[in-house]
Amino acid sequence: MTLAFTTFAISKINNSSTNEDSKVMILCDEHHPFEKGYFKSAIRAFGNSIKLGLMGNSRPEDAASIFQDKNIPHDLTTEEFRLQLVCMAFSWFIFGLFIACLLLCITLVLTSRYPGENENKATEVVPSSNIDDEEKQLSLSDMI
């Protein structure tokens, strides 16, 4: 079973979508060959998704109007268009992981500097001079 990816051509004149059989991805009449690189597309989509997240928009459909001026044609490929939601989720996961590690480090630093009362009492050695004389006598009589 072979997976076939469909690419679309979006024309500026009548805003209609048509199927394209070649391996060329077209968006706003700009051609982007598939051999341009999947890694480069993923990196650009990751950067665009972070920009969208900082602007408070999680939908990649609005990417063209957010990033580019209407007079300047944008070069967002369909592959980057598909990757933006995944990259958005991944960027929020990394951000959450960073915050969790930061909170864990702060907690560990604070607990190492200021031990709790229970831990402090358990590790202290009670000096023998603080024991009453009666307790000393009781302990000596128990030994005999």
Swiss-Prot record:
It is a single-pass membrane protein. Glycans are attached at N14, N15. The chain crosses the membrane at residues 90-110. One of its GO terms (cellular component) is membrane. It comes from the Eukaryota. The keyword tRNA processing does not apply. This is Putative uncharacterized protein YOR186W. It comes from Saccharomyces cerevisiae (strain ATCC 204508 / S288c). The lineage of its organism: Eukaryota, Fungi, Dikarya, Ascomycota, Saccharomycotina.
